[in-house]
A protein has these predicted regions:
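Membrane-interface amphipathic segments in extracytoplasmic regions
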Residues: 1-223
Length: 223
């Protein structure tokens, strides 16, 4: 998704968890200084509020349901093989209660209060699942006040074509390539994982992540 060509060269990556950020950072790590941009590849703690007013940023988005499934399996395997990020005590309990993302999502609004409470606990305890796009962009008013700072938005569903467009826009070397989906550097889930959600799970997640869809629609409407 092309936005604007910046006059300034300082370009900051806002890394939202489980939106293909690791793959993008890996692809750009050797090409952060191009003719049109000096790129800064930040960690998850860097937000829109950290971008200086006279500088620019880019980030990637992903459907909240897909992001949920990806986050579940990523944390279930503790980030391996690329990382080895141990569970928190809360995550350990959550994964003792739920083996699949579909099981967790199904119980979110269960009539059985024990299932519902356990599901809510897991949703609030598992890293990436328990954060929001708004954690990085504050609120709609602030996001819109900084829209001129946002020069490119990747969509996980069109990542390859978006990346080619990004390279052309900022004169980044053609040698910069996204890692193969199954490589460690991509930090993606094993294709053998059961990523399917049934209808109840989908409806529950759309209800739970209602504010996330507000953000996605705001991005599409604004850019």
């Amino acid at each position: 998704m092309k936005i604007l060509f910046p006059r300034k060269k300082h370009l900051h990556f806002i890394h939202i968890g489980k939106t293909a950020g690791t793959a993008l950072k890996n692809a750009l790590s050797d090409y952060t200084d191009s003719r049109h941009a000096q790129i800064y590849l930040h960690g998850h703690d860097f937000k829109l509020t950290d971008v200086p007013d006279n500088q620019y940023c880019f980030f990637s988005i992903r459907d909240p349901l897909d992001r949920f499934v990806s986050a579940f399996y990523s944390r279930q395997r503790q980030g391996k093989p690329r990382y080895n990020s141990k569970w928190s005590a809360a995550e350990e309990l959550a994964f003792s209660l739920f083996e699949t993302p579909n099981q967790l999502a199904n119980d979110l609004y269960s009539d059985n209060w024990k299932k519902r409470v356990n599901a809510e606990y897991a949703m609030l305890s598992i890293r990436h699942i328990n954060n929001s796009y708004w954690d990085w962009f504050i609120d709609e008013r602030y996001f819109l006040s900084r829209k001129k700072s946002i020069v490119f938005i990747f969509d996980q569903t069109s990542l390859n074509s978006d990346f080619e467009e990004f390279k052309k826009l900022f004169s980044i070397s053609k040698k910069a390539l996204l890692p193969n989906r199954n490589s460690v550097n991509a930090h993606s889930n094993n294709v053998s994982f059961n990523t399917k959600l049934n209808k109840v799970a989908e409806l529950n997640l759309k209800r739970w992540y209602a504010k996330e869809y507000v953000f996605i629609e705001l991005v599409k409407k604004t850019f």
